[in-house]
């Protein structure tokens, strides 16, 4: 429930200056009121007519104007004055109440224009308080129903919040699983790539090793073939030289006899030395 806002009530200047005086009725009406017969007061009715000069005990102060021989109707002006005063006071009260009501209504209308929400809340609170006074059981039932509806709404909100939290947790778990699976797949791919590279390097090394082995296997055969060829060449050269030495000294003019020079003997020595190397090949380290 919202707090009640008490609004100040200011009286108009006409009311704040003093009590309002009722408008005096016209002279004709006053005369008519005087002419109309009024009922005698109780004191005047009970006054004995046999003793006109005596005043009853206890009423000397009120009826001091009574004189011997005067009629009982002299009490009427005093009664009329009292009635007029009472009527004037009642009219003043009514007029004041009306003015206050009007001023209050004006103030409420102004407040409604200035503060419509507060005024509505005040009206609702007033209506509820009145309803509680008039229909307490119904108000209690309404309050219980409102409380139950509020509790239901709170329960529903809590359930919705729980469901949302569960959904968020499930989504987060799913995302984490996906990330973990992606990381695992990436790791597997990297391992496969590394294994493939290792296999390729291993195969390449094996091929290179095979080529080296083949080359090493071929080298001794080449080495043995080369000395044999050299030996054949040396033998051919020796045969040619021997044939040249056995030829006659006299040859046709066209053929010139070529004597072996000193520089040609050295190759023969070198050939013999090479033959020895072929027969005794050096040891492989």
Curated annotation (Swiss-Prot):
GO cellular component annotations of the record: cytoplasm
Polar residues bias locations: 27-39
Tissue expression pattern: Keratinocytes of epidermis and other stratified squamous epithelia.
Quaternary data: Directly or indirectly cross-linked to cornifelin (CNFN).
Biased composition (Low complexity): 72-87, 120-129, 137-147, 235-248
Keyword line: Cytoplasm, Keratinization, Repeat
Protein name: Involucrin
Family: Belongs to the involucrin family.
Region of interest (Disordered), residue spans: 1-93, 120-256, 266-285
Comp. bias (Basic and acidic residues): 149-165, 175-185, 200-233, 272-285
Keyword ATP-binding: no
Function: Part of the insoluble cornified cell envelope (CE) of stratified squamous epithelia.
Swiss-Prot/TrEMBL GO biological process terms: keratinization
